């Protein structure tokens, strides 16, 4: 049984209306996982998000972002989300960012944050979410403890990042 089949089972399970049946099916499903052979390679972004969701429901809404302060909102289809995530990953790769690199994300919660997170998953990067409220001292400690290979930040944070 491949990973795509497992994800399809989970999606079917989540759509069940009968909670008692859902509980029984979930229990059997998780028992089966205990004996499953772990695949040597698996990339959720490529195999499941793109290989399953983009392929089968590309034009359907995958993501809705809303700003509670301004009431601005944006929605993205599976295809759009994948496009923006891949665009971000391609730019990172052109900049020399490679699989296994530590990528700090010091950005506000905007759609691009989600695209960058997707790019990290697909590209095998280690995503390091970083609070936008961090001080120079806190960043210095983090950078010494866990050095960044790449850093994605809103330009308003560049001064504190450069100082660290």
Please provide the spans of the model-predicted regions:
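Structural core segment of the AMP-binding/adenylate-forming
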Residues: 1-14, 118, 122-164
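Mixed-charge, low-complexity intrinsically disordered regions
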Residues: 18-19, 27-32
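Short aromatic/basic micro-patch
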Residues: 43, 75, 152
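Acyl-group handling in specialized metabolite and lipid biosynthesis
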Residues: 32-41, 68-74
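A short N-terminal helical cap/helix-turn-helix that marks the beginning
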Residues: 2-21, 39-64, 83
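Short, well-ordered amphipathic alpha-helices
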Residues: 47-49, 89-90, 158, 162
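Conserved AMP-binding/adenylate-forming core of the ANL superfamily
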Residues: 59-118, 135-140, 144
């Amino acid at each position: 049984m491949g990973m795509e089949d497992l994800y399809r089972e989970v999606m079917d399970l989540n759509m069940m209306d009968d909670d008692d049946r859902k509980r029984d099916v979930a229990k059997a499903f998780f028992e089966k996982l205990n004996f499953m052979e772990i695949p040597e390679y698996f990339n959720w972004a490529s195999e499941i998000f793109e290989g399953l969701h983009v392929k089968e429901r590309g034009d359907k809404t995958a993501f809705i972002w809303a700003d509670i302060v301004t009431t601005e909102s944006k929605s993205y289809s599976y295809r759009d989300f994948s496009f923006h995530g891949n665009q971000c990953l391609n730019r990172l790769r052109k900049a020399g960012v490679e699989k296994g690199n530590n990528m700090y994300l010091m950005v506000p919660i905007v759609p691009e944050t989600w695209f960058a997170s997707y790019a990290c998953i697909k590209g095998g990067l280690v995503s390091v979410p970083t609070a936008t409220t961090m001080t120079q001292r806190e960043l210095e400690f983090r950078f010494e403890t866990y050095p960044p290979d790449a850093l994605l930040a809103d330009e308003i944070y560049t001064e504190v990042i450069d100082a660290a």
